[in-house]
Amino acid sequence: MKKIFILIFCLISFQSTALEKKTTFSQEVFNKAQSEGKIVVVSSWIKYCSSCASQMKVLNKAKDDFQNIIYLNFDVGNEEISKLLNVQYQTTLLIFKKNKEIYRSVGETSKSKIYRAIEKSISNNLSISINSNASIGS
């Protein structure tokens, strides 16, 4: 029983650490970043989601490695933002550039795949788009 308690405590601690650097989604911040021509990475999460914590850990590292990008996230339970961004699942990762969604994935936690998507968005290669029909803040 003691081992189970310790395991649960460790898992909760890991999730808290992974989510500690999050920047909550704000329409104002999003629109300002887009108007300034910045790339915006948006991720959705939900409390007690281990894949969300894994994805957030990768994104926290990306914040250090790709500093000219705006990173935002939101709780997928926020219906207003979920509807605005057409997000139905936690760990949905979106990349926006020039007011267009240029990348979308669900459940991606691989550092190499997430970094590749960010690098392609920086290099103006918009062919990584899975759903480029979304336009926010125009």
Where are these regions (language model features)?
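Thiol-based oxidoreductase modules, predominantly thioredoxin-like and allied folds used
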Residues: S44, Q67-E80
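N-terminal leader/targeting and pre-domain segments
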Residues: C10, T17-E36, E119-S138
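Typically the conserved alpha-helix immediately C-terminal to a functionally engaged Cys/Sec
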Residues: S51-D65
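Short active-site neighborhood of thiol/selenol oxidoreductases, capturing the structured segment around
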Residues: S35-K47
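Solvent-exposed loop/turn segments at secondary-structure junctions
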Residues: I46-S50, G77-E80, T92, E101, ...
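Structural micro-motif
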Residues: L85-L94
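Sec-dependent N-terminal signal peptides
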Residues: I4-S13
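Non-catalytic, surface beta->alpha helical segment in thiol-disulfide oxidoreductase systems
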Residues: K97-S135
